[in-house]
Amino acid sequence: MTVINIVSGFLGAGKTTLIKKLLQESFQNEKVVLIENEFGEIGIDSGFLKDAGVDIKEMNSGCICCSLTGDFTIALKEVIDQYHPDRIIIEPSGVGKLSDVKKAVEVVLSEQVKMGEAITIVDVAKCKTYLKNFGEFYKDQVIHSQAVVFSRVDFVSEDKIQEAVDQIRALNDEAVLFTTSWDLLNGNQMVDLIQQKENLLKSLEAEMKHNHEHHEHHGGCCCSGGADHTEKEACNCKGDGHHHHDEQKS
C-alpha cells in the first residue's frame, strides 16, 4: 500500500522544514519518495535525504500544476511502479492550486494507492497579506487541506496568531490547526491527530448517510420538505410514518 501526502504552502512558509520533521519523527521506518519541482523552495540537502532513505524525482518540466494531465501523472505512476514506496510526499510549487494537485493524484489511486492527508503551511505573520494579494491560490490551499500548520508562531503575538486562526477557520472549519511552536511539535503526534480527525469526519459522514437513507426508506413524512426533526412537536405528522432523532447531548 502506498499513501500519498501533499505538503503545500507559499514560498518560505516552511514546507521543506516540515517535511524533514515528518521524515525524522513520523515516517522514519517507511520507504518514502519525495516529489518536488524546481520552482519550489530550496531543495532538501541530498545528503540528508540519502541518510533518510528518501529518493527524489524532480519535475524538470516546471511547475507541478502546469503539466497535471501529462508529465506529472506519468512521473507519479513511474515512481509507484519503480520504487513501490510506503509513502509519497508531494511538495508542489508555492503558487500551485492544491485542488489541481489532488485531482492529478486521483488519477493514480487504486486499491494499492491511497490518498493521504494534505497539509498546508501558513506563515502566521503573512497570512492576512497573502489572503489579500493571492486570494485565489491561497484560499485554495487552505480550503482543500485536512490540516493547517502555522509557522513563525514564535515571532508574533498571541493576538496575531488568533487573527490568523480566525481567517483560516472562516475558509475551512474542519481542518486540524496547529499553532504550537515547531520546537515543541512532535511529528508523530501531528500525524495521529490529523488521522483521528479524518476518521471522525468519515464516521460522522457515514452515520449521516445511514440516517438519511433510513429516513427515506421507513416511510414518507407528511411535513413540507420531508426533513428530519429533532423535536416531535415540531413535526406536523405527529410522529407517524417515520422516526424522529433526538439531539445528541455532548
Residue ranges and their predicted role:
Residues 2-8, 13-131:
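Nucleotide-state-sensitive switch-loop elements of NTP-binding domains
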Residues 3, 27, 33, 54, ...:
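Generic hydrophobic/packing signal
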Residues 10, 39, 87, 138, ...:
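Broad hydrophobic/π-residue packing in well-ordered secondary structure
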Residues 39, 111, 143, 147, ...:
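Compositionally biased, low-hydrophobicity segments enriched in charged and small polar residues
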Residues 50-53, 136-138, 194-198:
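Short, hinge-like loop/turn segments at secondary-structure boundaries
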Residues 82-187:
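Phosphate/Mg2+-binding loops and adjacent switch elements
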Residues 156-250:
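C-terminal accessory "lid"/substrate-recognition subdomains
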